[in-house]
Amino acid sequence: MKPGHSSVPSVVNASPNMRKFWDNSALTSPADAGIRTTQVVPSTLSIGNVIISPATVLAPMAGVTDTVFRRFIRNLGGCGLIMTEFTSADGVLRKKDQKAKRYLHFYEDEHPISAQLFGSDPSVMAEAARMVEGLGFDLVDLNLGCPAKKVVKCNGGSGLLRDLPAIGKIFEAVRAAVKIPFTVKFRAGWNDEEIVCVELARMAESCGLAAVALHARTREMGYSGQARWEWIAAIKDAVKIPVIGNGDIRSPQDACAMVAQTGCDAVMIGRSAPSNPWIFRQIEQFCAGMSAAQVETGAEPSKPHMGTAAPGCPVERSSTVFDSHDPTARVGTTREGLGFSRAANASLLERALASEELDTPCHPEEPAFGDEGPMHSARTVRVSSQDNKSRLYDHPSEADRYQMIRTYFQMLIEEELPDAVGKMKQFASWFTHGVPGGAGLRKAIYESKSAPEILARVEVFFEARLAMQPVSADTH
């Protein structure tokens, strides 16, 4: 706890203190309104002594953000901070709960990384936080956003939003227990009549937390409707610690719009990442392109002509394996050889975008996502090939999707996860959204019984697609 703050601040209704502009459609529908500013996502963010660069965060998602997916996202580039699946504090302290402990497994190349915990007992939360610190995590985070009934009924996740004094006790206990930065992710309130996000953010700052993240929906909203970005702006007005915005970021334009309209210090992306794992890379490229342009004069950023080399890049770009990770160059990869092909499959991609949305809901048996929920949203931004700003970042070709699926599968196999086949089904489905004929492939994948069978179906489908030959998803 910070010196001079010996008690939890009194709880009052925060709604009267919030800026009264949510009737402004340009603010409540930012993705539909488009970008009206040149402001970009910050290049760095300091959370305590941890430097996040760029200021983008992979949200914690149950069933998704295990060590394989986190490293997969990290290798693609552009993500400044990754977070674990939300994990029961009580579970990690039980000796026999190996599943909960598996959630906290990570590798050195995942830094900086934050562990997210949920629970309602201050002493248990403090002990679990000490364990997290001892394991080498850079930050520890408290989940106050999960709307799942089984979590809420135990007074965890968003269930605690109805009891701010109890939250204050957890804040104080955890802050006193660890030296690493302590953060919190929460929703705006239980419902529209109980908006507590501003008061909660002030409480967090008073108790010495290093940053706050808001999913700009209430628990009652679940994942429906549009995220209320004005609540993020209200929190930013109320506190001096970093504020991370979360909710309805589907594109680089959305990310920049959130920063411009709320003043938030970083953006957090959850449900878009599984179906569009390159979104962090796209945001980094987009912001680099916007920053490089003469935006103060109103000049539109220019795009390197297809077939010409951007600074530091050779002209020949026929492979998906590139030489460097340079966001200003619009091409590049990481040490794992992941990246985007420059233009080889542009016509295929345009037809794919014309036929299917990239964020089509997944198979009904998709996993629970904790606070992030299933992959669907009422607000969807369609990337258009005619949009000048969308040309500032790479769009994945079918060859890219194919390579990413194979790379992710190989990582799952090497990690020997007990649910590897299930995860292969989930992510193969997500990665193929937007590909013509993908629905048939997804059905075939779901019916597959083994990893080799899934791999065979994916291989036959994509090899035929890349050869521009129609093929059935049935590979029997």
Which sequence ranges carry the predicted segments?
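Non-cysteine beta-strand/loop elements that form the S-adenosyl-L-methionine
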Residues: T84, D138-P147, S206-A216, I269-A273
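Intrinsic disorder/low-complexity segments
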Residues: M1-V41, C287-P396
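Hydrophobic faces of well-ordered beta-strands that scaffold small-molecule active sites
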Residues: T56-A59, I82-T84, I113-L117, V140, ...
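Active-site beta-loop-alpha junctions enriched in small/polar residues
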Residues: M61, T87-A89, F118-S120, G145-P147, ...
